[in-house]
Every structure is written in structure tokens, then in C-alpha cells.
């Protein structure tokens, strides 16, 4: 299985890549280190995978994760054509109703999600600002998970991994609940 992770910018060093390479050595890990388009910022570069000509499920994940226990169950969790599997949102950065995912992990068939990539590319700047401007999340760069969730619901079935498989460590509860 192919796993794609984004490390653009200097917030996370190469040690994060090394960690994931070790933990995911049974998989084919691909790194997105440069924007695929100069207009696309940071984590929004996950959209690139939705444009790949791959007709099998792939995983797309954040780099700032700690994998413990039977974590391979996450990557091996079944997904069918017409579905998009996501990590449940165990913390919220929005008060808006109707959002249930965390953008830290997706599994899908890229060919099924090509319409999401196309939609994004039609208005890159607009979509990167949309969820910030509408008060769904805070800037300067956020909102890609809301864009994906809204777009998935247009044509695909959104499936969530079991909630009890995930947690977040935070210094303060107000970080978890904002």
C-alpha cells in the first residue's frame, strides 16, 4: 500500500520522516516535500494525491503523529470504491455543526476523489481562505479537512475509523476543545 505524507516548510524536521519510515517500513511511503503548485500552501498539498492515476486505495497522513499499539490496523482498514475513510475528529477547532473528521488521515481511491482535486484547483486561493473567512477555523493556514469533508459528502460515502483508536495529548484542555 502507498502512504503519502506532507512535510513542507521547516515546522517539522527530518526526524519526523525518519520516525514514520521506521514505523511504516512494511508500506511504500511517499513524501510530498514541495508544493505541487506555487499557490498551494502547506497541508493543502495533500490534494495532490487526489489527482494521481492510481486505481487502488492509498493513505494520506499528517507527519506529526505518534503510532502506538496495533497501529497497522489503521492502514489496513478496508475501504471500498466510492468510500473515503477518515480519522474521527476527537478535538474541534470549530463551533460549526456537521463536521466529524480530523484531516490527519485519509484512505481512498484517488480516481474516486479526482473531482475534489479539480474543484480545489478551480479556486485554490478561494478554498484556502473559505473556511477561515467563514469562521469555521482559524488562519493563517487551515481548513483542508473541512474542504475534503464537504467535498466527499457530495459524491462519496464518508467512513470513520473507530473513535477509540485515537487520542491527542495536549498541555491544556482548551487546546483540545477549541
Regions inferred by a protein language model and the residue ranges of each:
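Hydrophobic/aromatic beta-strand patches that form the interior of the parallel beta-sheet core
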Residues: 4, 30, 59-61, 85-86, ...
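Short, solvent-exposed loop/turn segments at secondary-structure junctions
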Residues: 8-11, 35-37, 65-67, 90-93, ...
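A generic structural motif
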Residues: 29-36, 86-89, 137-138, 143, ...
Amino acid at each position: 500500500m502507498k502512504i503519502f505524507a506532507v512535510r513542507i516548510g521547516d515546522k517539522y524536521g527530518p526526524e519526523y520522516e525518519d520516525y514514520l519510515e521506521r514505523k511504516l517500513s512494511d508500506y511504500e511511503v511517499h513524501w510530498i516535500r514541495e508544493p505541487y503548485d506555487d499557490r498551494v500552501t502547506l497541508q493543502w498539498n495533500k490534494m495532490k494525491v487526489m489527482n494521481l492515476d492510481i486505481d487502488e486505495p492509498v493513505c494520506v497522513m499528517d507527519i506529526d503523529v505518534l503510532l502506538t499499539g496495533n497501529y497497522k490496523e489503521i492502514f489496513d482498514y478496508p475501504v471500498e470504491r466510492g468510500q473515503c475513510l477518515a480519522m474521527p475528529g476527537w478535538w474541534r477547532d470549530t463551533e460549526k455543526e456537521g463536521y466529524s473528521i480530523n484531516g490527519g488521515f485519509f484512505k481512498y481511491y484517488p480516481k474516486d476523489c479526482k473531482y475534489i482535486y479539480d474543484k480545489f484547483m478551480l479556486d485554490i486561493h478561494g478554498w484556502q481562505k473559505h473556511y477561515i473567512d467563514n469562521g469555521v477555523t482559524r488562519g493563517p493556514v487551515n481548513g483542508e479537512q473541512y474542504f475534503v469533508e464537504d467535498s466527499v459528502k457530495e459524491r462519496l460515502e464518508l467512513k470513520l475509523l473507530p473513535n477509540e483508536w485515537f487520542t491527542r495529548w495536549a498541555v491544556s484542555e482548551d487546546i483540545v476543545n477549541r
